[in-house]
Amino acid sequence: MGIVLEPPCPKSVDGISIDPEPNWNFESLVAEIASVEKKLNGFSMYPQPITNTTLRMGRRGGGFVMHVSEDEMESDEGEESDDEEEEEDHSQICTAGKRFACDELYLSDESDEEFDHEPEYMMNKLGLAESALYEVINDHQTEIKDDIRNQVSVVETEIMNEIETSLSAIARVEKYSETRKEVERKLDLQYQRKVAEALDTHLTAVQREHKIKSQIEERKIRSEEAQEEARRKERAHQEEKIRQEKARAEAQMLAKIRAEEEKKEVERKAAREVAEKEVADRKAAEQKLAEQKAVIESVTGSSATSNAQAGGNSIRAAESALILENHRLKKLEELETTNQSLKSRSNENFSSFEKHIGRVIRQISGTKDSVSGKINDIVKIFKDPRCPVSISIAAFAKKMVTTKEKPNPFACSYVIVYINSQFPQVMDILLAEFHKACIYTVPKHIVNSQSAWDSDAYERLDSIMRLYGALVQTDIRVGNATNVHGIEHGWAWLARFLNKIPANRATATALNSFLQTAGFGLHQRYKSQFLKVVNVVREHFLQKLRAKKDTSDLLVIIAEITAYLDDRMYLKEPEGRAMKTTSTLSSELTAELNQPNYNQNYQRNDYRNYY
């Protein structure tokens, strides 16, 4: 338990509090005394200066220290700021002498009556015993404070030691952490170095492989460039020839211009010839239309065998096939009439465009880039504003069917389908050209009107039927490129052929050529139904051929059809059906041509109404 010492006087007198723990310096004391003096002067008429006194015990004591409480200091802060100059004057007086002086204080005689009472003193007078007790208490407090200060110093020293120890430990921990981080950094650096070495090795190998591939591609590109350069030179040579022909024609035209009379005569003759030709063509078209109408009417009124008698010749064909043939031939005639009118009204020579189309068709080969390139070339010709589209379509259909140097029929069929996707009227005109060139593409047969066929005629028949078979089996389903005369039309043709067409060398050649190119696609689509048709060919069509009296010219074709059926060649994809790859194509055509083996996944449909 501690001893609490309290002075034998009130803790606060006139706003002045006694501080149990004095810690003032001399300047603070002087300022406080000046403040007290100012307050006391307010109650005394004649303020008395404070002087030094001796202790009652007959000895001089230490300086008396007064302390104002914090509450009083806060209340007096405003007053101290107002009397700052006055406090400085009092401080100088107290420092120079040993008493307080108020030299600047003005006292008037009129204010003497206001303060008649006796002066008051700051402290009550103490007795001897009380003074001694106060001294003892003060000494005891001083000793206790010294002990407390010593203990606080010891505690502070121990705390500082603990802090230093903690700081040292923290420094060691941080140093250890830095050491571990450095070790981990070195390990990570070593690992990254190993990864970089492995990656560099891998990249070197990949780069070497890519370099080898690039060398191979460069050699391939150089080879293709050489071929393209040769083709370019050939095209340049052809263009030069065309240019020379045009120059020659222009020279002739200039010669005609010089002779105006001759030119007028030529124009009059040409006009007469054109008019006569138009009249003749119109008459021929009307006559042909009348003949076809008569044929259709005779077919419509025929019996189940569909035999029509016309001038002693019997036409054997299905009624639906004849209607389609007539419809297509009519479109072709209308197109030819339109083209003739365009040629007569225009001074432009369109033969160069027709020759260009024929040259492009002859250059078609069984490669993807060739097919794509020729399609682009033909489309450019069709879109050339110098030549009407109808003339280009007619030339394309005629050249495609009648070209003797027949290229790959499968490649030509792809070209036909894609051109028809751009210009839908092409297919009917092309089929009409097929029907004009070979009646077995209808299929149709005229009995007792067949003249002696030579080898060239059979070759043309074989070429046309192979192209027709390749066309019907071509199945392309990308964007707008759809075969409108697809495999179902081939199935209908085969049914009509076996039902209506008799067996002879020409019909056998047509059937064999058709099966060679379309048999694989028909089997892929119709499976067991196609096998039934194969049995019909074997048991009926071939038997009729063998039953002929003179079979010397039929032995070869019978052997070919028999080998095709017995060896089941319809299970093997025909040669040339799959396009070869020679370069990289970046078009919609390439995506379709890259289909594996071009095996069309046909859906089963019933086409019984075609029989």
Swiss-Prot record:
Localization per record: Nucleus envelope; Nucleus, Nuclear pore complex
Superkingdom of origin organism: Eukaryota
Alphabetic keyword roster: mRNA transport, Nuclear pore complex, Nucleus, Protein transport, Translocation, Transport
Region (Disordered): 69-94, 220-243
Listed GO CC annotations: nuclear envelope; nuclear pore
Acidic residues bias spans: 71-89
Entries under InterPro entries matching the protein: GLE1, GLE1-like_sf
Example GO BP: protein transport
Knockout or disruption consequences: Lethal when homozygous.
Quaternary context: Part of the nuclear pore complex (NPC). The NPC has an eight-fold symmetrical structure comprising a central transport channel and two rings, the cytoplasmic and nuclear rings, to which eight filaments are attached. The cytoplasmic filaments have loose ends, while the nuclear filaments are joined in a distal ring, forming a nuclear basket. NPCs are highly dynamic in configuration and composition, and can be devided in 3 subcomplexes, the NUP62 subcomplex, the NUP107-160 subcomplex and the NUP93 subcomplex, containing approximately 30 different nucleoporin proteins.
Similarity section: Belongs to the GLE1 family.
Biological role stated in the UniProt entry: Required for seed viability.
Protein name (database record): mRNA export factor GLE1
Organism of origin: Arabidopsis thaliana
